[in-house]
Amino acid sequence: ETAHGKLRMLEKGCFQDIDVALMMHGSPTTTVDVKSMAMSKFTVTFHGKKSHAALKPEAGRSALDALLLAFQAVEFLREHVPEDTRMHYTISQSPGPVNVVPDTAVGVFSLRSYSRQKLDGVVERFLKIIQGAALMSDVTFDIKEGDRLANKIPVLKLNDLLMENA
């Protein structure tokens, strides 16, 4: 799911002279699938200011607070996106002891939809969430976009031919 082999082949020019490609996955049954989700993946690093949480909490700016606010905002966004949208996230880094305001927090976000066009609209709103979380926490952020995948465009007639000859 995350190696994106066909994307790498496309980038290297493997499909230059090809009009149609048939994709196969091992399965105990013979089936055809007409769906594949578009995906945008982001790694977001919030940068705050470290401070002792008991002795001088007002001097700190919590990068982790910003990341948690972003997570919560994604939860609120779920009600306002197309039904087929999927949004996932995880904390990949937030070092330090619990009594120190963390100056770094890293989250990974995966946004998916069966429509690249619809997903692009969700991505716009997601980017505003990250900006807002940083603003609310008085921190800065870096964002790195990972692979940007298009949804598969099925050729239903080919699916029918495949099943007729399976």
Tell where the protein language model's regions lie, with residue ranges:
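Metal-dependent amide/peptide-bond hydrolase catalytic core
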Residues: 68-166
